[in-house]
Amino acid sequence: MFLLLFFCIFASKTVIFVSKFSYLSVIMNISSVISRRLGLGEKQVQAVIGLLHEGATIPFIARYRKERTGSLDELQIAAIEAENTKLEELERRKQTVLATIEEQGQLTPELRRRIDECEDSVELEDIYLPYKPHRKTRADKAREAGLQPLADLLLKQDPRTDCRREAQRYGKPDETLQGARDIIAEQISMDERSRNAVRREFAYTAMIRTKEIKQLTAQRAQEAANYREYFAVDEPLKRISSHRLLAIRRAETEGFVRVDISCDQEKALDKLARLWLHNNSNAAYEVEQAMEDSYKRLLKPAIETEFAASSKQKADAEAIRVFAANLRQLLLENPLGQKRVLALDPGFRTGCKLVCLSAQGDLLYHSVICPHPPVNKRAEAETILLKALHDYCIEAIAIGNGTASRETEAFVREVLQSSNQKSSNLQINETIPVFVVSENGASVYSASKIGREEFPDEDVTVRGAVSIGRRLMDPLAELVKIDPKSIGVGQYQHDVDQAELKRSLDQTVESVVNYVGVDVNTASKHLLTYISGVGPVVAQNIVNYRAEHGSFPDRRALLNVPKMGAKTFEQCAGFLRIAGGTNPLDNTAVHPERYAVAARLQQAKMSGREVRLEDFVSEEVGLPTLQDIWRELDKPSRDPRNQIEEFRFSEAVHSIDDLQEGMSLPGIVTNISNFGAFVDMGIHKDGLIHVSQLRGKTLALHQHLTVEVLSIDRERNRISLKPANS
């Protein structure tokens, strides 16, 4: 009995040991592959994977674990995470493939070795293809008819073989030869060498071609006109830009064009011939027919689908990269800060919705003014505006950039200039800055669940105006409440992989929020949700605790929040600020785990002696962390964003009809893509600076610049620009 028990314990421990050994070997293999692919040290990769598996976030690893990762930045860590996810999925797929082949009784040691060593999903699927369950094919039917021996005989291509005589043994020669060719065709198509040969030819010579679909209704034909530059595309696939490929695919989805991707057929068949044709015998002729059929019916469609998918994937990745870069710039847009703001959501027929906000963004007052046609209550609008400016001590004005924006801006500036010239008890500071603010996303917020939660008793127009005002005060705090896809800085965002787009944009928002940091005593739950390690549940708990117990006096008090365990605190503490708390370090990016060394550095700094950071290096704290701490001590509670600057459009233009070629106008960059930058000149239609006009210059989202009008296509409502003096 004792021996049996000992054996059972030993056996179970052996299984655990083997499984752990297997897991560790997989991790080591994955680290090695990622290291080669990304050109990073294997120890760096192992450290990142280990930290990710421990539950650490990318912002936390990048900022607070530099010694372990060799100071890898967020992009490098994110790349490791993405590669690790792919390779872990590949490992899971390998196990499925191995199990399936083993069930069939066809798993040899050599086949297992090839699968285990495989590092690419395409290669793995090629290995698996002959064993993969599939619906019955022409070749399957031929095998069931007993024609496999005939196919094998033909493949030998013996010059002495009389093909028709051999075929007659199995039935009617024409039918049996066709069946044998079907078997050979499938065999060729499933052969790794064949597939790789055709892939190489596609990689070198594949062309993407489009053909216009002309049988359209009048309305559909009008819609199709927007895609006319894609009606007769004939370009090398490897050279086509991502935005053109996505536009072509959208035109295909809309039913305006047919798309074909094909390589040089003659060269592809020549490559296959080198693999499968050995002489000029009659049997070789049968194999050649099967080979051509295999290419046209099986190989080309399969490889075309592969290249269509891979090219789309690359285009998606590039579009998502551009979107994420634009989003990052938008989230880091310069804030006005905590000032009292009057915000206007402009309009003609329904008037302009006016709201006044406190320095904390609370709604104090709202009204509607109608200074424009068709209502034309200008005097009343002026009175309401002046009273609101006076009563709420307004320090800045935000005007949405939608319909009637220019007219509303002109009205406001005129009122400010003339206010103190009129006999009135309301003395207004005519130098109150006026800002035109993007409305993108404001209407989405106003109708959203978040908007309803924040202002349950107000209608959508009030919520929209509040969003415009708050966006001026702190773009980051307001934009996190809006789905990034609604902000309007994407490129073909509805055409790309939606899951990958969401992952990338969420990662971007998380990165920016943690880069800036948030005041835990004032931040909304929506902003707190993106803090490293927090999430929606803990964010709500922080807000609830704050409401019940008042402001947090220090970071340690966060541990009293429900579900704020030690791990969550470790991940989030450095990114949460406490202004005016009991410990000045709580208002910096210094992590509580490094307060002791920060205190020693501060003491050395205050001594007036020269401080050598190298003298403070220890086993736990290296030079990179010490440099970060020193920067925080040098500029505590700093905001990495700059102060917003006032901007004015030209008074000479209000619509595309006012434009002339050669005009120089002030503008704001509203969107950046691979093919150029879009610029708002205050005429409700953005112009395009084509990438060829930038000449290596890099523009930033919402950058102020002067542009020159190159050309105007009024029929298509398009404006071409270039940077002035370029």
Regions found by a protein language model. Give the residues of each.
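Duplex nucleic acid-engaging cores and interfaces of nucleic-acid transaction enzymes
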Residues: 60, 76-79, 86, 90-343, ...
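Accessory alpha-helical DNA-binding modules that contact the DNA backbone or grooves
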Residues: 57-58, 73-140, 145-171, 515-643, ...
